[in-house]
């Protein structure tokens, strides 16, 4: 059962796997109903997950492989009860995600899309935008991706880095903040790089956004659920 990852499917097929493609919920349910007794492995993504009732319907399931780092919708207790291995790709995409996070930050802070569109219209807008150099970057979640972002920010843009994590790290030179609010207060730019799931649900709320202030910039390369959408809309609409 795999979401569409067509470029890599031949690798699995050449390794001897018989693939059952189920990219939609209806196809997934049909595949489990039709082939449940023959399925040994499941390939999924964190937002799609794999649930207890689905695990129960696959009597010969041995492994659930999650593409990417997040596995918040995989029922770990159900897998553990059956001694089913659950794996993920933690850290594999960290460099490319970190590159993209800095690209988004540059694009946002320097207003590159709007400036590009303006030049293409033959305009020359004389607008001064902030620089990244020498600014304060707050990273919410200093895992593999957060570490890669911090490295690029320090070495590439001469930024100072602070972070908030579930626990302080003793192996980094960056300043630890005890809460997301404290981190936002100490930041010009704020990058969200946490896991998804219940533990981080709406972790970035009104209090964090208020602490970041109307001149702050925020980039979220984590799950959308980490930021309170209602609070974000309210902050934008009221220029806070």
Cite the ranges covered by each PLM segment:
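N-terminal glycine-/charge-rich "phosphate-binding" loop or analogous flexible N-terminal tail
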Residues: 1-41
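Phosphate/diphosphate ligand-binding glycine-rich loop within oxidoreductases
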Residues: 38-116
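Conserved beta-strand positions in the Rossmann-like core of class I SAM-dependent methyltransferases
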Residues: 20, 162, 225
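Phosphate-binding beta-alpha-beta segment of Rossmann-like dinucleotide-binding domains, i.e.
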Residues: 82-84, 89-136, 140, 144, ...
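Rossmann-like adenosine-cofactor binding region
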Residues: 50-54, 166-240
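Short acidic/histidine-rich motifs immediately flanking catalytic phosphotransfer sites
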Residues: 33-41, 59-62, 185-190, 213-216
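Phosphate-coordination loops involved in phosphoryl transfer and adenosine-cofactor binding
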Residues: 61, 133-137, 206, 215
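Active-site regions of enzymes building and remodeling cell-envelope glycoconjugates
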Residues: 14-20, 83-84, 172-180
């Amino acid at each position: 059962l795999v979401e569409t990852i067509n470029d890599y499917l031949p690798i699995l097929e050449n390794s001897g796997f018989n693939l059952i493609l189920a990219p939609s919920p209806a196809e997934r349910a049909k595949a489990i109903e039709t082939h449940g007794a023959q399925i040994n492995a499941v390939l999924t993504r964190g937002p799609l997950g794999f649930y207890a009732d689905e695990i129960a319907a696959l009597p010969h399931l041995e492994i659930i492989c999650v593409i990417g780092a997040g596995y918040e919708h995989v029922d770990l207790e159900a897998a553990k009860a059956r001694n089913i291995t659950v794996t993920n790709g933690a850290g594999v995409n960290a460099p490319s995600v970190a590159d993209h996070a800095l690209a988004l930050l540059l694009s946002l802070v320097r207003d590159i899309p709007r400036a590009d569109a303006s030049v293409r219209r033959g305009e020359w807008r004389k607008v001064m935008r902030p620089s990244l150099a020498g600014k304060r970057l707050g990273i919410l979640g200093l895992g593999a991706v957060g570490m890669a972002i911090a490295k690029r920010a320090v070495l590439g843009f001469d930024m100072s880095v602070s972070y908030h994590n579930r626990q302080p790290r003793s192996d980094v030179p960056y300043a630890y903040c005890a809460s997301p609010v404290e981190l936002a207060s100490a930041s010009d730019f704020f990058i969200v790089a946490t896991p998804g799931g219940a533990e981080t649900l709406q972790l970035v709320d009104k209090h964090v956004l208020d602490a970041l202030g109307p001149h702050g910039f925020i980039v979220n390369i984590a799950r959308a659920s980490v930021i309170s959408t209602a609070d974000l809309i309210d902050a934008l609409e009221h220029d806070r």
